[in-house]
């Protein structure tokens, strides 16, 4: 019974976080996963054309499954702009919403890079 409560707690927290539409904020950039490196690290091509190594934080490792071709938000590190953390994954329907909200050029650029 207690285990079910814990599972439902994490499921509700994950679903509520994923239901809100999120745009890249200050210090964040839109990216596309191009390669899985292992150990929670991914090679991501960002909207500015740079290829960065981004890691998936431990709090998201079991909740967020990524594969090549997924669109993500990368929070760049302050001390090393060549690396960052993946903080959000966009679903397929969210990519269409991104295009409607003015990120169509960035998505087309990411598709042309990859």
From Swiss-Prot:
Q: Identify the SUPFAM superfamilies for this entry.
A: Nucleic acid-binding proteins
The protein's UniProt keywords, in alphabetical order, are: Initiation factor, Protein biosynthesis
Q: Where is the S1-like domain?
A: 19-91
Query: Known Pfam families for this protein?
Result: eIF-1a (PF01176)
This protein's GO CC annotations: cytoplasm
Note the superkingdom of the native organism: Archaea
Q: Can you provide one Gene Ontology molecular function annotated for this UniProt record?
A: RNA binding
The alphabetized list of GO BP terms reads: translational initiation
Per the entry, what this protein does is:
Seems to be required for maximal rate of protein biosynthesis. Enhances ribosome dissociation into subunits and stabilizes the binding of the initiator Met-tRNA(I) to 40 S ribosomal subunits.
Q: Which family does it belong to?
A: Belongs to the eIF-1A family.
Against HAMAP family, the record matches this protein to: aIF_1A
Q: What is this protein called?
A: Translation initiation factor 1A
State the organism named in the record: Pyrobaculum aerophilum (strain ATCC 51768 / DSM 7523 / JCM 9630 / CIP 104966 / NBRC 100827 / IM2)
Lineage in the entry? Archaea, Thermoproteota, Thermoprotei, Thermoproteales, Thermoproteaceae
